[in-house]
């Protein structure tokens, strides 16, 4: 699965063959087909498992700490670690959605919506803002985290991790208006 994820991330799902995956994984076609029915099944596994891991962590953290600053800190750290240490599954998911079966796509979207909602509720409490403002902050944080692991040309992983953590802390600790309406610049 990891070999397939690396290939899908580097070349795109449509440009990777089962033969490419087998060669990268060091297995034969028949061995691969004992575990997966098709290349599409491999794609589903590549994106589904990491999304479920993120969601299960978020659920367990919320269960233990509620929608609190502690929950948000743990969500941010886990998301940063997942993006830096993982296979790029969220990037692949975002780019290859049309290659997924519709039923599976709907399920994955529901999981992502729940994941975002847990973040949003924790940000609302931590930053003392309404849910709409918290949702904007959630997307700003997660999209920034999701995009920066690709920029490791001159920095090592730990340097990127430190920058991402500092960025998240700066955003969360900023003095945010309580509502979206309060966020508009004066005179608008």
Question: Which positions does each model-derived feature cover?
Answer:
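Hydrophobic alpha-helical connector segments
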Residues: 45, 59-85
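Short, structured motif recognition centered on aromatic/hydrophobic residues
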Residues: 5-8, 54-55, 72-83, 91-93, ...
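Amphipathic alpha-helical segments used for helix-helix packing
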Residues: 83-103, 150
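C-terminal peripheral helix-coil segments that are non-catalytic and often amphipathic
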Residues: 81, 117-125, 151-188
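Short coil/turn segments at alpha/beta junctions that flank glycine-rich nucleotide-binding fingerprints
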Residues: 10-14, 65, 86
């Amino acid at each position: 699965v990891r070999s397939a994820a690396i290939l899908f991330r580097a070349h795109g799902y449509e440009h990777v063959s089962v033969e490419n995956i087998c060669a990268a994984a060091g297995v034969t076609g028949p061995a691969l087909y004992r575990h997966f029915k098709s290349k599409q099944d491999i794609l589903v596994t590549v994106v589904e498992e990491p999304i479920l891991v993120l969601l299960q962590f978020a659920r367990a953290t919320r269960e233990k700490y509620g929608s609190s600053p502690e929950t948000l800190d743990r969500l941010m750290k886990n998301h940063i670690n997942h993006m830096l240490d993982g296979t790029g599954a969220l990037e692949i998911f975002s780019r290859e959605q049309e290659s997924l079966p519709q039923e599976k796509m709907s399920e994955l979207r529901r999981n992502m919506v729940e994941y975002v909602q847990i973040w949003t509720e924790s940000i609302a409490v931590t930053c003392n803002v309404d849910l709409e403002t918290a949702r904007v902050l959630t997307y700003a944080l997660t999209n920034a985290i999701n995009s920066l692991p690709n920029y490791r040309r001159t920095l090592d992983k730990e340097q990127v991790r430190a920058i991402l953590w500092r960025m998240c802390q700066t955003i969360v600790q900023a003095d945010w208006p309580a509502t979206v309406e309060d966020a508009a610049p004066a005179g608008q």
